[in-house]
Each structure stands twice: as structure tokens, then as C-alpha cells.
Amino acid sequence: ERMVNLTLEMIYLLTGEHYIPRKKSDDGGALHAPGSVIQKENNKNDKKILELMSNIIQLLTGEVAIRTGHVSIYFSLDEWDYIKGNKDLYEEGIKEEPQQPLPPDCEYEDKSDITADLGGTLYNYNEPSKIRAEGGDFCANGNPTNPEISPMKQPPPANGIKEEVASCDGGRQSDCSINPLTEQIQGTDIPTPIMGYNHLIIQAIKDNENTSPHESRFDRHHTTHTTEKQFSHHINLHNDLSIHAGKKPFPCSECGKCFAGSSELNVHRRTHTRVKPFSCSQCGKCFSNQTKLKYHHRTHTGEKPFSCSECGKCFSTPHVRARHQKTHTGEKPFPCSECGKCFARSSDVTVHRRTHTGEKPYSCSQCGKCFTRSSDLNVHRRTHTGEKPYSCSHCGKCFTTSSELNVHRRTHTGEKPYSCSECGKSFPTSSEFTSHWKTHMEEKPFSCVQCGKCFSKDTHLKYHYRTHTGEKPFSCFECGKCFTHNGSLKVHLKIHKREADFCSKGNLTNPEISPVEHYPPTNEIKEEATSWEEGNQSDYSINSLTEQIQGPYTPTPIMEYNHLIMQDNKYDVNACHSPLQETDVTKHALHKRDIDRRQRTQTQLKYDHRTNTGDKPLSCSECGKCFSTYHVLARHQKTHTGEKPFSCSECEKCYARSSDLNVHRRTHTGEKPYSCSECGKCFTRSSDFNVHRRTHTGEKPYSCSECGRCFPTSSVLTSHWRTHTGEKPFSCTECGKCFSRETYLKYHHRTHTGEKPFSCSECGKCFTCNSSLKVHFQLH
């Protein structure tokens, strides 16, 4: 509507016909032209027409122009509002502008004036009280009547733009030097002062405040524009002219790479100096530019302002959103030249090519382990440093990866994204949902070969097998009691935890409460001991103490026994080393047992704490793998030392664990206790039998969190996972080549030894692996 009004007003000034816009009437008329023609005042009309044209251009482009000499500078409306609101910033920039000497050979015949066009109103800067150039006054004696601008004699130099105009006092010259514009500070939203243009901007603001919007300045608008260019946001005129000329005058002294602007060069230099001046106030992490710091802050605040238009998923940075959107379009423009596999990003195909070349350019300085991705190396380094940079804002618990933190956060938020369509019950993880789904399907694919009992999980079947074999692999560190599964052990450990809580309250030195009454013995105790009162002999009997039952229990008081253990703090740790009478043996033994138990309990509490926090402070000196307890570390180190203390009496083959020896003995006896009810095939191990059953059921319970692919065994999933991480832990001792699976390393070893154990029964040809033999069989 405003555009129409301005256009009609301009038509009126040009033609004298006064058109009036009207609403559409019943007879269909849209415009009424009364035909009245006014007497035009040429001078005033020209001024008004120019003002109307400027307003129309401003509405069309959304920009405000400042013109000076040969150059026009365009600001957006938001930028111009900001400049008017922060004129103090530009006034300060004027004071800091250096004085430029006047070249002696510059002569101009005509005078010049400088104008600024602000939103349709043109401003002239030729009064000495309003504008001053670096070399002298502009037009000290008044306005010129017919100014002309001399064209530039040479291209602008690389270090700035210099425009020379004639003074108005007849022969005295002054120059107007436009200094290099100060560089935009990367990542900031505060414009820096515009060197050389500040006086124009400030004067335009003052004129805009003091001048009526209807006052015309057409008489003062006679500037000829030889160079016009729009400079958006924070202006850098010098860089723009360099880009326009195709110049890159800022070379890097390290690598020789050139840049069009010095700000780009400064950012590039940080790749050589590794300077990271922008640090996070939350975690102290440093970054090379402020944009990266801004994105990093969102990991603390959880802000994700960029949402996907397809699925509504939100992201913290626009480039991550762009990468996500390719999952909807299915675009994968980067193919692998070796196998033809396509990827959405060029970086992914670069990493993928390393699976063909075997290249692992990222090595750990601590243990020498190599990786194909830098991100995998960064995660691996945390096993050495113990760094856990992802902390929960609710409880403060820390994690090594962001995915672990995301799963943990659901315990606070209660988020359960996996819901059952049958009953509506929700679960925080996909694995829990899969287990629940089997309860609706009544699927119990795991059956016991001994008794036929069926289970929904292979772990439940594994625990059930132990009721037949009597195996109890989980032992208590305190008392040595063994259990079939870890859950029963945890319940049992609560007994010792109560003991630790009791000891931590200082009751060992309290004469009124004895810690022994919280340790139920396994049989009846009857002892004679000397009373602490007047040396009389007394009998003390402890009855009704039953054998310790697994799980929580209620401590049974030991009647009148407290004073035998402690009286007035006479028994302490040092008392255990004092000479004892025969009648004091019981008191000493019970008290020493209490001291030993407290020490063992403290150790167990330390291990329990590591289990809860995930802390693994004990690392293997050979490979760097970490463990939470010493005995697990010791068991692992046997794989490096080759220690195998359990030997077979038949063939003298040795094993590191007794369970492995028991399975090996079946190779001599021929025992295969686990048989398949579908095909009748038998197995020596229950684990092998469980894997075999999945070939009938088609079950693949182990899914990859990266690509969703499922596998029948955890070992196959582990091998598959290495295709994502690029890990190849099995290296050849001969040539150093690394492999992701041990079987691949085994086949590779045969290329060095020349072993070919698989022979063809038809022609006798031998092969290093069975798959090659199968391919050969097809020829026959």
C-alpha cells in the first residue's frame, strides 16, 4: 500500500494528474482521475521526486545508502538502526583515525562535495563545522555551485583506498583518505568502527536528527558515482576490492597459502600456532574461534535451535542438521572407488578407504595403539587420562562419551522413548523393549537340554544350567561364599555393607555395643572367660544362632558378651600384639576377627564404589586396558604372560582358567552333553549350543547401535563394531599388519609359514582357509 501511494504521488508530480486510489465500487471502477492538473513548480517537484524515488528504492531493497565521493556504502535497515544507536562507538573511531599527509602532486581544478543519501533524504558534507577530513577542511568557504568529481587516476592500492578532492579555497589542497577498514572480529555481533567512514556516519545521524523529513537536498546531490558496491553487515571495503580484483594479498608465512583478508589469515594462522584464545567458562575447554565456542556452549545448555523440517529433530549447529537431512533424502554422492559403497560425506569415504589400505594414521603416544579416526583416538586417550568430559547436570556423574551421558539422562528425565504397541508400556532402551516384547509373544526360545525348561533370555538359561552343573562363579571377597549369578552376590554383599556402616559409626570403641553381636557365627559358641568385674569366673553361652542365610538378616544379640570384648576402650589394634593369658584367647580372637573384617569390608566398599561409578583405575601395562579390581587385572595379564596353571592330565595341554580345562577334557572323553532337539547335533559347550539354536529360530539378539544391524552372537557384534570404529587390535608379529578379527590374523599367518591345512579330496590341491576350498570345490 505504501509503495502504491509513493508511486501515485510521483505520477502526480510528473504529470500533474492527481490520481486517488479508491476501493472497488459496485460499477467496477478502481481508480478515479479527476483530471485536475496543477501548476508544477519544477525545482520543488524535482526535489520531491528524488526523495520519493529514494523511498521506493529503500522499500524494494531494504537498504540505506551513504554516498561519499566515488563510493556508495549500503546498510541494511537493522544495521543503520544499530549505527544510530551506537554513534559513540564511531565517534571514538574518528578520534583514532591517523592523519594522512597530502601528496604534493595532486591538483584538481574543481571543487567537490560529499553527500550521503539516508532513506530518501540526501545529506551534504561540505560545511567545515560538520565534517573534517584527515588532511584538512572540506569546502571551508561554502557550497560549490557546479562541482565535478575527478576520476581516479590509478586502481586503489592494496593497503587502503585514497581519494583526493580539491579544496574550496583556490589552490589549497586537502585529501580525504579512506583508511583500511578494521577487521571484523570473528564470531562477535558488535560492529567495529569503520575507519575513514565514521565522520560520514556520525554526520548523517546528526543531520537525520536535526532535519525535517520533508526538507529536500536535491540541489546538493550532484555527485557522480564511478564505483558502487553493497557492503553487507560489518564493512570491509579493502577486502571487497581485493576480491573484486581477484587478489589475495595476505600470504601465510608457514605454508604460503594466500587469503583475501587479514582476518582470514589470522584465523588460518591458529592452525599452525595451535592458539585457542576462546575458553569455555563452564569446563575450561578452549577453541580457536568464537563460533566454535558458541556451538560448544550449547552442549552445556542443551540448546538446539536448528530443527529438521521432515521429522522435527533438533540440532545445535546448522551443519549437523544439514548432515542429518541427507538421511531423509538418501543422498550419498561420495562413492568408494574400491568397492562402490556410497557415503553422504566426503570425510566418511576418506575414512572408509582406510579399511582397504589398512592405514591407521592416528596413534596413541602412551601405548602406541593406532586408529583410523581421530575421534576414536580421542576416546581411547581417556582410558589413560581418566578424563570423563561429559557430566550430568543433575547428579554430577561423568562419562567418557556423549552417548553414555544421553542414556544416563533418561534416569533423571524419565524419558522412555521405546513404547510397546500391545500394552503401552515404555522403556528407556531398545534392549529392554526387546526383552519385554517377548513376554507378549510368549517366545521362550532358550530351552534346557537337561530338564526341558524354557527361558526368554539366554542369560536366564545360562544361570539355570548352573543348577545342573553346580557352578558358582561369583564369590564374595569377604567370606568366600559363592553364588550362581551376580544378582545373588549383590544381595549377599548387603550383609557386609551393614557391617561397614556399623564400623564407620565408631562402635568399635563403644563399650556399650559390641560389633561381634552383628557377626552371627556359623555354630554355637560356649566359652569361659574372666569377668572384668572383681575377677570372677563366669560362663557365657551364645544360643539360637542359626547358620547365616543368604540375603538380609536380623542380627541376634549376644547376651552379656559385650564386656568380654571391650571395656573402657582397653582393646584396640595394638592390643592384639600384647601378651595374652589363656583365658583371654577368645576375647582376642573375636576382636582380631573384627579388625580383619573391617579392613576387608573397606576394600569391598571401594570395589563397590568403582562398580557404581564405572571407575577403572587399574590399567594393564602391556595394552592399556583398564579394570576395576586387581584380580580381574591379574586374570587379564595372563593373556600377555602366557601363564596357564591348569594342565590336562591326558595331553598336558595348559589353560589359564579351570573352566576352560573342564571343557577341554570333553575332547578326550567325547562327551557332548548339549544336543539340539531340532537336528540332533551335539556340542561340548552350552554357549556353542545356544548359538547353534539361533540358526533354527533366526534370532539375532545383538544389535548395532550405529546402523541397527543384528547379529546372533556378541562376538560377531564386537567384530562388526570395529568396522565403525576402525579398530584393528590383532597385529602380525612378522610384518605388523593389523586385523579386526583374530581369524583373519590366523589366515594371514599362514602366508608367512606357508601352511595350507585345507586340501581338496578330488585333486589334492591345498588352501590356507576353508572358504577358498569351498570355492575350489565348485570347479569340480
UniProtKB/Swiss-Prot annotation:
- Keywords for this entry? DNA-binding, Metal-binding, Nucleus, Repeat, Transcription, Transcription regulation, Zinc, Zinc-finger
Start and end residues, zinc fingers (C2H2-type): 250-272, 278-300, 306-328, 334-356, 362-384, 390-412, 418-440, 446-468, 474-496, 618-640, 646-668, 674-696, 702-724, 730-752, 758-780
Q: Where are the transmembrane segments?
A: none
From the record, give the cysteines joined by S-S bonds: none
- Major localization listed first in the record, in broad terms: nucleus
Provide one Gene Ontology cellular component.
transcription regulator complex
Tell me the compartments it is located in: Nucleus
Q: Which SUPFAM superfamilies match?
A: beta-beta-alpha zinc fingers
Q: List, in alphabetical order, the Gene Ontology terms for molecular function in this entry.
A: DNA-binding transcription factor activity, RNA polymerase II-specific; RNA polymerase II cis-regulatory region sequence-specific DNA binding; zinc ion binding
**Superkingdom as given in the UniProt entry:** Eukaryota
Please give the Gene3D superfamilies that the UniProt record associates with this protein.
Classic Zinc Finger
Instruction: Give one GO biological process term.
Output: regulation of transcription by RNA polymerase II
What this chain does, per the record?
May be involved in transcriptional regulation.
Family statement drawn from the similarity comment of this UniProt entry:
Belongs to the krueppel C2H2-type zinc-finger protein family.
Protein name as it appears in the record: Oocyte zinc finger protein XlCOF8.4
What is the native source organism of this protein?
Answer: Xenopus laevis (African clawed frog)
